[in-house]
Amino acid sequence: MYALDFLFIAFVYFAACHIQEKPVRAQEVQLPPGQECQMTPVIHILKHRGCKPKAIPSFACIGKCTSYVQVSGSKIWQMERTCNCCQEAGEREATVVLYCPDAKNEERRFRKVSTKAPLECMCRPCGSIEESAIIPQEVAGYAEEGPLYNHFRKSF
């Protein structure tokens, strides 16, 4: 009887050691076509108090990314979590002029406002992007192409 208990305990111990040596990876789940994270053209309505709203072409990051929770391969009493979100990988800045008819001063009838658009989109760990990741469009090579050409500033 004790020999069977010993063999069972030894089997469980060696199985646990074997599991801990092999890293366990999450199963890749393919999203249906068209649902992956991608940069999508949108119309952005810029608003400022006292000014007329202005519609401009822009981009947004839209789509789904894989997230999961599973038992840890190295610590079977713990769970591993991975959360990915469809986010921008860098940003572009633009300055747009809005017409403000209610301004008392003639000089303030046209107000410059800044806006941002993603440079590209990708699945990244959920959280906010660092301000240092913003790349001026001249560096990114977008200064002379695309629907945003007239909206983005040409020099700093």
Curated annotation (Swiss-Prot):
Alphabetized PROSITE patterns for the sequence: CTCK_2
Cellular-component GO terms for this entry: extracellular space
Cited InterPro entries: Cys_knot_C (IPR006207), Cystine-knot_cytokine (IPR029034), DAN (IPR004133)
Key words, A-Z: Disulfide bond, Hormone, Secreted, Signal
Subcellular location: Secreted
A GO molecular-function annotation: BMP binding
Signal peptide segment: 1-26
Assembly, per entry: Heterodimer of burs and pburs.
Name of the protein: Bursicon
Organism: Manduca sexta (Tobacco hawkmoth)
Gene this protein is translated from: burs
